[in-house]
Swiss-Prot record:
Contains 3 disulfide bonds. GO terms for molecular function: toxin activity. Disulfide bonds join C2-C16, C3-C12, C8-C15. The modification 4-hydroxyproline is found at P14. The cysteine framework is III (CC-C-C-CC). It is found in: Secreted. This is Conotoxin tx3e. Expressed by the venom duct. It comes from Conus textile (Cloth-of-gold cone).
């Protein structure tokens, strides 16, 4: 998934914070 440990991974939206 795009959300990993609260960080935004490149090319993924929306981002998790």
């Amino acid at each position: 998934s795009c959300c990993n440990a609260g960080f935004c991974r490149f090319g993924c939206t929306p981002c998790c914070y």
